[in-house]
Amino acid sequence: MHFDTSRPFFRPRRAQRVALAAMSVGALAFVSACSTASSDEAADSDTLNIVASTSIWGDVAQAVADSTDGVDIEVTSLVEGNNMDPHHFEPSAADMARAHEADVVVVGGGGYDAWLYSALDDQDKIIHSLPLTTHDHDHGDEHDDEAHGHEAHEHVAHAHDHGEEGHSHEVESIDGNEHIWYDPTAVMEVAHEIAEHINDVAPAANASDEEVVNQVSGLDSRLHELGKKNYVQSEPIADYLLAHTEMEDLTPEGYRHASLSHGEPAAADLAALIDELKSGNVDVLIYNPQTQTDMTTRIRTTAEDEGIDVVEIGETPPDHQNFFEYFDEVVSSLEALDA
């Protein structure tokens, strides 16, 4: 059985303004004095400009922006769609100019989108979930913010209550895994930080993270109800997603470490994973189509030959699909395993 979570779902989104009313020039004059004239239109003094590394964080920011009253907000995402691996994205000069001039920059951190935040002079305007480390592919060491000399918007190990169900856990880095947006708590914390920043700038805006919390806490509750299954991953895309479920990851450690480091697993590590798939102990393969190689194709073929269910979980949603809708599809695909 194959659960495809990559089908398109069209709706208008990102790079649009939440234009409820214009603020005074002084209230939102956050554009740097060194901004170039060519980008003045994109950074109007009465507009709060938010730049996100990917559409995931752009959708989180947009959901908060949609809750505001009396403030003009523009959200721009630099990476959209699922036709590329965001690990290797190279921003254009225009992308970086927009980020430098933005009032707020939203990233995941942990090295994943270091191509954006490592080049910014003003690190204090960055909202992030994992520490702002460089992407040196060394995931064996503990991450920290020392390279940047500050503790801007740190969310790691910040507890969040998930409501009546009592599902409360902390945002913690799992083996240096960068896919933090699949941690419901991390998403809610970033939304909270965005709302706080908007309200600091424009108190009358009444920005709220309520919509994000409502959507994501519901998904989190559904994840907690997943049944016991054994799985392996073509790449550790679902670590945060499944961390608080009864599902067990049987991916061999050598293969896992190599894929976390964005390296090629050794032949012995690949053989160990293939053997695991053939052992009869694996119920599902979690497959990341955006990091597909000849090796991962072989892994998928083996799983399908063994009658193992395949659930696709990508780095980013397809173009024109909202992250929350994509997240819902991913959870639905996992729930279908229990049907």
Show where each model-derived region lies.
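Extracytoplasmic metal-acquisition and chelation regions
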Residues: 2-24, 30-339
